[in-house]
Amino acid sequence: MAGHSQFSNIKYRKGAQDAKRSQRFTKLIREITVAAKQGLPDPEFNPRLRSAVFAARKENLPKDRIETAIKNAAGNVAGENYEEIQYEGHGPFGTALIVHVLTNNRNRAASEVRYIFSRKNGSLGETGSVSYLFDHVGLIVYKAESVNFDDLFSHGIELEVLNVEENNIEGLYVITCRVKDFGKVRNAFYAKFGEPELARLSWQPKDLIEISDKKLIDKLSALVEELEDNDDVQYVEGNFAFAGLSLKL
């Protein structure tokens, strides 16, 4: 029956969406846990934790789960210890990707990331195999609707950041700074403009490859999506952009 089939499809889609949401929550809690263990368990005095909590709230992670994760990390409650690892790989068409991982099993993570690259016409490389194509910087991003660009720019000059630019396609203001200055710059922008949409160390491509061919876009999108669907992968950075499309942070 058509009605039954449609209902089954709806249930399937809802199940897939729920699974994605659950996975996203797990990754957010993992980042909160690591951030709280690395510094003070108070977001006001731990910028990485503050950013993690802000991201969790944007995703509607329940407040009690955020607080429990912080308390468990602060109290050293028995649990899994996570290791931060960065993998470098080559994607199709000369693209380069850096995969950021938080894992409790290094061997499993490496095996799964390698398998995904090989399935999607790419290859996992050695440390340093693609990172030379990027600049390692501090990255701070604000929504254009939330702050005044001239004020942001002036503050950036005072702090001697590398760049403050407008991304009109995505409606964002993007600040980059030296890695050694990141903590100071992040705190200064937070004090004046509030919590940014994103604040983290980032690998920014020296030369951006713009891709407009739909088949190439589909193949690269499939690679990035499968990597980010992996439980251990927090996010992926690359040296490419899709022409005319807005990329998520």
Swiss-Prot record:
GO terms for cellular component: cytoplasm. Pfam families: TACO1_YebC_N, Transcrip_reg. Disulfide bonds: none annotated. GO terms for biological process: regulation of DNA-templated transcription. Keywords: Cytoplasm, DNA-binding, Transcription, Transcription regulation. InterPro entries: Integrase-like_N (IPR017856), TACO1_YebC-like_2nd/3rd_dom (IPR048300), TACO1_YebC_N (IPR049083), Transcrip_reg_TACO1-like (IPR002876), Transcrip_reg_TACO1-like_dom3 (IPR026564), YebC-like (IPR029072). It is found in: Cytoplasm. It comes from the Bacteria. One of its GO terms (molecular function) is DNA binding. HAMAP family: Transcrip_reg_TACO1. Belongs to the TACO1 family. This is Probable transcriptional regulatory protein Wbm0670. It comes from Wolbachia sp. subsp. Brugia malayi (strain TRS).
